[in-house]
Amino acid sequence: MGRSLKKGPFVDDHLMKKVEVQEASEKKQVIKTWSRRSTIFPNFIGLTIAVYDGRKHVPVYVTEDMVGHKLGEFAPTRTYKGHGADDKKTRR
């Protein structure tokens, strides 16, 4: 279920300030954030945002296709190690 259109998209204020400072500066640095709930805006394009996955910050390079999605969608929180191998040989 999506967010109501009358409310508009959500971005944490501290993240938006960091993005505005980054746009004003010449250097491109990685922006660290814990805000997985923030929506990606068009002015984020071309920036690298390190999104926290509960263990480490995952660098996410923002492209045009990502606009409108949440930052947390691009930093998975669970690592899938695969199912166990078939143990028929070891059971004998």
Swiss-Prot record:
It comes from the Bacteria. Protein S19 forms a complex with S13 that binds strongly to the 16S ribosomal RNA. One of its GO terms (cellular component) is cytoplasm. One of its GO terms (biological process) is ribosomal small subunit assembly. GO terms for molecular function: rRNA binding; structural constituent of ribosome. Belongs to the universal ribosomal protein uS19 family. The gene is rpsS. This is Small ribosomal subunit protein uS19. HAMAP family: Ribosomal_uS19 (MF_00531). InterPro entries: Ribosomal_uS19, Ribosomal_uS19_bac-type, Ribosomal_uS19_CS, Ribosomal_uS19_SF. It comes from Lysinibacillus sphaericus (strain C3-41). Keywords: Ribonucleoprotein, Ribosomal protein, RNA-binding, rRNA-binding.
